Amino acid sequence: MRIGLFAVGRLKSGPEKDLVARYLDRFAKAGSAVGLEFTRVAEVGESRASNAETRKREEAAMLLKSLAEGSVLILLDERGKALDSEAFAKLLGGYRDQGKRELTIAIGGADGLDPSLYDRADATLCLGKMTWPHQLVRTLIAEQLYRAVTILSGHPYHRV
């Protein structure tokens, strides 16, 4: 199954970008052993519309346009369901085992996600009850993708 990230906003050079690249590289190297492949980070610029609702709608349209047909869509949202790392790995493995070919994890813009995306989403997850800056969300989800691969493969990276 091919996995990609969609993010509103561009990650500037710095330690966060370096960490994201490091974890996604590890994911790419280890994922093929468990049937997972990393495709890309699709970054789109934030909408310049004058109000939040229009910005969210425009950003949602960009996300939907970038989705492959039949792609599983996982939204990251502070009101989503909290999973531990093993449950996240099981979720990804389950989609893979169902024969899903594409999965996209979406990180919304500063205003959040448009309501239309929740209807389209297969799952809405959170990274805890706290609000995180977007650059750290990318780092956290990249690490969790790598951790999921190590859990699915039985690698000792994930120790409880």
Curated annotation (Swiss-Prot):
Its EC number is 2.1.1.177. The keyword Transferase applies. It comes from Rhizobium etli (strain ATCC 51251 / DSM 11541 / JCM 21823 / NBRC 15573 / CFN 42). GO terms for molecular function: rRNA (pseudouridine-N3-)-methyltransferase activity. HAMAP family: 23SrRNA_methyltr_H. S-adenosyl-L-methionine binds at residues 76, 108, 127-132. Homodimer. Signal peptide: none annotated. It is found in: Cytoplasm. Coiled coil: none annotated. InterPro entries: Alpha/beta_knot_MTases (IPR029028), RlmH-like (IPR003742), tRNA_m1G_MTases_N (IPR029026). Gene3D superfamilies: 3.40.1280.10. Belongs to the RNA methyltransferase RlmH family. It catalyses: pseudouridine(1915) in 23S rRNA + S-adenosyl-L-methionine = N(3)-methylpseudouridine(1915) in 23S rRNA + S-adenosyl-L-homocysteine + H(+). Specifically methylates the pseudouridine at position 1915 (m3Psi1915) in 23S rRNA. This is Ribosomal RNA large subunit methyltransferase H.
